[in-house]
Swiss-Prot record:
Residues 236-287 are cytoplasmic. Heterodimer with uroplakin-1B (UPK1B). This is Uroplakin-3a. Belongs to the uroplakin-3 family. Keywords: Endoplasmic reticulum, Glycoprotein, Membrane, Signal, Transmembrane, Transmembrane helix. It is a single-pass type I membrane protein. One of its GO terms (molecular function) is structural molecule activity. It is found in: Endoplasmic reticulum membrane. The lineage of its organism: Eukaryota, Metazoa, Chordata, Craniata, Vertebrata. One of its GO terms (cellular component) is plasma membrane. One of its GO terms (biological process) is sodium ion homeostasis. PANTHER family: UROPLAKIN III, UROPLAKIN-3A. The chain crosses the membrane at residues 208-235. Residues 1-18 form the signal peptide.
Length: 287
């Protein structure tokens, strides 16, 4: 089975080699969310320009970006002397009036391509991805910095189709050595408005509907329980006050009756008459 880097390189080939190459979107294995609203990740041209014969000298690869349109579909990136264009993002209105140079990187010899088997190593994952991929639209500050030096790779426009081209430049002569075809149109993602989001419950799972229903009705039941607890506490307090008042009334009515009627009745009936009769009897004896 051929190494994975060979598979990636062959994925960028179209109809042969040399000028018949096209830049391709990065594999979903390495860039799951691609393109985004403002960025596009591409596979670097590994083993493309030097696949048939080794190159001698120092070379760089320039990446050009162009907004897709009928008038600029086959736009040139070099002048009549084969000198590569140095147009910037600002000069071309973000690629709308012509291609601009978004990035430049050294050409990695085919024999020095890093092994993708090491991508499982977390410490080397970023290094390997940078060796195989290039992302367009990652610099969000270069347009705002008046002192910025170098290539400006600002965010792309959302919902816009772009084309991309790799150009091989011989750094000794400063001339174009080779180049790919323009890529097929690649469209950046579109911002989804909140009003366009489908919230119909029919597209939700049964579990989501049950959980949503429970959470929605839970505050209602809590409110009912709280109100019931308040009513019960008020009823219990009223019963306790009524019982205390009833006991105090019974006590107040019972005490005067026992002190005011029993004792005087007992004294007047049992003791009063017997004392009067004894006094009368004693006076008669003295006479």
């Amino acid at each position: 089975m051929p190494p994975l880097w060979v598979v990636l390189a062959l994925g960028c080939l179209r109809l042969g080699s040399g000028v018949n190459l096209q830049p391709q979107l990065a594999s979903v294995t390495f860039a799951t969310n691609n393109p985004t609203l403002t960025t596009v990740a591409l596979e670097k041209p590994l083993c493309m320009f030097d696949s048939s014969a080794a190159l001698h000298g120092t070379y760089e690869v320039y990446l050009y970006v162009l907004v897709d349109s009928a008038s600029f579909r086959n736009a040139s990136v070099q002048d009549s002397t084969k000198t590569p264009l140095s147009s910037t993002f600002q000069q071309t209105q973000g690629g709308r009036t012509g291609p601009y140079k978004a990035a430049a990187f050294d050409l990695t010899p085919c024999s020095d391509s890093p092994s993708l088997d090491a991508v499982r190593d977390v410490s080397r994952a970023s290094e390997i991805l940078n060796a195989y991929l290039i992302r367009v639209g990652t610099n969000g500050t270069c347009l705002l910095d008046p002192n910025f030096q170098g290539l400006c790779n600002p965010p792309l426009s959302a919902a816009t189709e772009y084309r991309f081209k790799y150009v091989l430049v011989n750094m000794s002569s400063g001339l174009v050595q080779d180049q790919t075809l323009w890529s097929d149109p690649i469209r950046t993602d579109r911002l989804t408005l909140y009003s366009a989001i489908d919230t119909w419950p029919g597209r939700r799972s049964g579990g989501m509907i049950v959980i949503t229903s429970i959470l929605g009705s839970l505050p209602f039941f809590l409110l009912i329980g709280f109100a019931g607890a308040i009513v019960l506490s008020l009823v219990d307090r009223g019963d306790a006050d009524g019982a205390t008042s009833h006991d105090s009334q019974i006590t107040q009515e019972a005490v005067p009756k026992s002190l005011g009627t029993s004792e005087p009745s007992y004294t007047s009936v049992n003791r009063g008459p017997s004392l009067d009769r004894a006094e009368v009897y004693a006076s008669k004896l003295q006479d």
